[in-house]
Amino acid sequence: MERVERSAIRVEPFSSYLERRRTGPIFPVVTAGGFVFVSGLPPFDPATGEASRRPFREQAQITLEQMKRCLEAAGSSLERVVECNIYCTDAARFDEFNEVFARYFPSGSPARIFLCVGAFPGSFDLEVDCIAVL
């Protein structure tokens, strides 16, 4: 089997947060085969770099802004996202999330799922990952 070349990209404050909480190399963004893979991002507090509980709409906006920042660090953009996965602790937040999401994808949504999960290991309600074309 042919080896796939991957490049990990550091994006602060996300990289430092992941390193403080996990063992082993974990990166918020990896590129491979002409694609950008953004790891699941909770809503990091921009001032502290820590995941924190905020009102849900604010969590959604912060998370999507972070995703945009990660994509741009890799040389891509929201317009090049082909798949987006949303993990949320409350299915009743579906419409509320969609209102925020639509502002980031005004010309049409990528393929996506909105999955309800039990809980996260932190004080937040939302995590988003995506795949984009370079």
Predicted feature descriptions by range:
Residues 1-65, 69-82, 88-134:
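N-terminal presequence-like segments and the immediate start of the first folded domain
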